[in-house]
Amino acid sequence: KIGYGKLRFSLGKMKNQSIPKEIKALLDTISWTEGTISREANGYDILVGYTSNNSRKIESWNENYPKGHQDHNWYYPRADSTAAGRYQFLGNTWKEVSQTYLNESNANFNKENQDYLAYKRLKWRLSNKGISEQYILDTLSDKEKFVKVSNALAPEWASFPFIDNNGMQRSYYGGQNARDFEDVY
């Protein structure tokens, strides 16, 4: 089991903000659920549908990548998607968070911006459900609390499990595959 409390903390400096280690671990967990964490470049250069048998990567990507999100609709067996990067940002989402938090319409798709904007998006998703950052810090040892966190993040990251009122888990978006909650927690 991977569990968000067990992951290595691979995030670097984020826009001069101090990110609690539990939040860094949660961002690593998101990357793991999206299937990008163990890839070359730690997933920052991955396009939706990447496997070891194909080369769906952002051409010429590096940590200081000077271009924005490509916002190209890539064919993926289950659906077309614009998802890219470590956190599989959709093109429209990237532009929205770029404008909101960086005051740019399509910020550079580099490592620092991907980490920072994923952190901001995570906080936004959680706050919409009344979940504070402190609540996250308290969930490492409380599985029931983490269900609330998982359900809040599932609409943003389809690979995150959504647990319904009957305890059944699924992807928030019916046709996609979500990771098993026991593996995520």
Roles of regions detected by a PLM:
Residues 2-107, 116-185:
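Cell-wall polysaccharide-cleaving catalytic domain and substrate-binding groove, primarily
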